[in-house]
Amino acid sequence: MEILDILILGSGPAALCLASELAKQDLNIKGISTKSPNEKWENTYGIWASELEELGLESLLSHRWCKTVSFFGDGENKKGDTPTKHNYDYGLINQEAFQNELLKKCKGIEWLNETAKEIKEKNKLSEVTCFSGLKINARLVIDASGHKSNFVKRPVQNEIAQQAAYGIVGKFTSPPVNKEQFVLMDFRPNHLNNEEKLSSPSFLYAMDLGNETFFVEETSLASYPALSQENLKKRLYKRLNSKGIEVSEIFHEENCLFPMNLPLPFKKQFVLGFGGAASMVHPASGYMVGSLLRRAPLLAQKLAIFLKEPQLSSLELASKGWEILWPYELTQRHKLYQYGLRRLMSFDESRLRSFFSNFFRLSTNEWVGFLTNTLPLPKLIYVMSKMFINSPLKVKLGMLKLN
């Protein structure tokens, strides 16, 4: 009977990021997934360029923008249309190049076209039974199949906030954003009536892709219940039409829906998670790729060390893995971000615009560190305190839950 060191569930970015690091560790590894790891990834992945530069991976960007802005005014006059300039480069990852780079590093790892039905701990090992009837034994199972994992256990939480987005890559009757411009957040509400302004806020995320092609996406940062794709599509078209812009050709439609505030998994369990299954989505932004790339190497190195101890069971290996993935520092940071997200979800569009306008008055290092989850805990506490002190009264009251 073959006993793997590690069996990975999934074949998306999280699975391949970790597998590409584990492949360096001289371990017996396989993966299983309903999709081939070679199947093209459809979603677009944006990232602050510095996150890839720090890892020497900036060549994976298909586009890079220096003109990065947001709009937090009311859109009613010149002042309300004034952009907030970020002066920080943003990039779009070339999905094909990113996927191929990871697959190249995963050479030697076989992926089986299987789906796990049940995972049991048996004689200190993990026995995975697939829907086909195939049984696979491994010392450790890592679920990197996404946030809908059936095997990673976490505290029950009824109200899970979701980030939802509907987007279009296409051509338009006139440019939806300026030439060579990237818009992180356009919260201007002047295309909405008073009743619509009372509903859960959303913003435009948009970029010039060149050759008269643009990506525009209506995004709800976090909402419970989630905004529907139909609602977001209507909002996007209304936003465009209010500027006299019509869609002339669609190359790709994007639909996004994922949880922003999943509780952290229990650390004492015999399955380890990674990516969405491990609650690694950043509650402040919804981003995860940078975190996957930064956190995979250490986890892979530590797991290789733990696996050298033959007496360790699946439960012990996974528990040690969870401690590496979610140490005290990262856990406390996550709690702070989740608190902030809960407060933002209670803000109407006016208060939310005021919050973000104030947020981007932080120094570049502070707001970038906040959005990329790279600030050490003491610095994060300092930045959040500074942000609160400098906030307008209505934002302070909202953060304190007093209004």
Task: Locate predicted features.
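FAD/FMN-dependent oxidoreductases across multiple families
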Residues: 116, 198, 204, 220-302
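Beta1/beta-strand and adjacent pyrophosphate-binding region of the FAD-binding site
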Residues: 1-14
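Conserved Rossmann-like nucleotide-cofactor binding loop
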Residues: 14, 37, 148
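Predominantly flavin-linked oxidoreductase catalytic cores and closely associated redox partners
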Residues: 105-246
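Redox-cofactor binding/interface segments in oxidoreductases and associated redox assembly factors
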Residues: 9, 143-144, 273-275
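C-terminal helical "tail/cap" subdomain of flavin- and related membrane-associated enzymes
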Residues: 300-403
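A conserved beta-strand/loop capping segment in the N-terminal third of enzymes
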Residues: 49-114, 119-123
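N-terminal FAD cofactor-binding segment of flavoenzymes
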Residues: 17, 21-75
